[in-house]
Regions:
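4′-phosphopantetheine-dependent carrier domains
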Residues: 1-153, 187-189
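Short N-terminal strand-loop motif that marks the start
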Residues: 145-189
Length: 189
């Protein structure tokens, strides 16, 4: 049985076939998007191919899952390789996979019954693969965006901040309690 990631009919056919054998799945792991070129050596053809195997295949999978009745899936894990930088000053080494995260974030909100999770591996090394397997087996709680870099696990966190900590980071004009007025410097732009 083979399917094309950019073909929605193939994806539906696959899920219909799976449903007949196992109407309940512990999870689906999408790995098609991890084989992209590094950003610096990306060509137009490679970008088109990575979009087809990455974002389009994820879209077709999610749409097929949403349209398939009689198949229960506990978890949908979308795995990327070096698509997310850990520091806002860094560039993602494999930027072509970033749309998978964008679509995955939409799927998390729009298809809440699918329990989509995004996992980014830094190098796809043996220890990261072992961490990914542990992550998938454990269910990993409520986290839906995870970066596994070596043996370290990173997730988003909102942390309370005191006004004293923010002072100096936020420009003083934003802190001023007095009203202000915005003016258009060049109309039409």
């Amino acid at each position: 049985f083979s399917i094309r990631g950019d073909n929605p009919d193939d994806m539906r056919r696959l899920l219909d076939s799976v449903k007949k054998q196992a109407p309940h799945l512990a999870g689906i792991v999408h790995l098609w998007s991890i084989d992209t070129e590094p950003t610096e050596s990306m060509t137009v053809d490679a970008l088109v191919s990575s979009t087809r195997m990455g974002c389009f295949s994820v879209m077709h999978l999610v749409q097929a899952l949403a349209g398939t009745t009689g198949l229960a899936v506990d978890d949908v894990c979308l795995v990327t390789h070096a698509a997310q930088p850990l520091d806002h000053r860094d560039c993602a080494p494999r930027i072509a996979q970033s749309p998978v995260w964008g679509f995955g974030r939409v799927a998390i909100n729009e298809y809440q019954n699918l329990r989509c999770r995004l996992v980014d591996l830094a190098t796809c090394s043996g220890e990261e693969i072992a961490s990914l397997v542990d992550e998938l087996i454990a269910g990993a709680g409520q986290e839906d965006e995870i970066a596994l870099h070596g043996e370290l696990r990173y997730v988003h966190r909102l942390v309370p901040v005191s006004p004293a900590t923010v002072h100096g980071i936020v420009p003083p004009a934003a802190e001023a309690p007095k009203p202000f007025r915005l003016e258009v410097a060049r109309p039409g732009i």
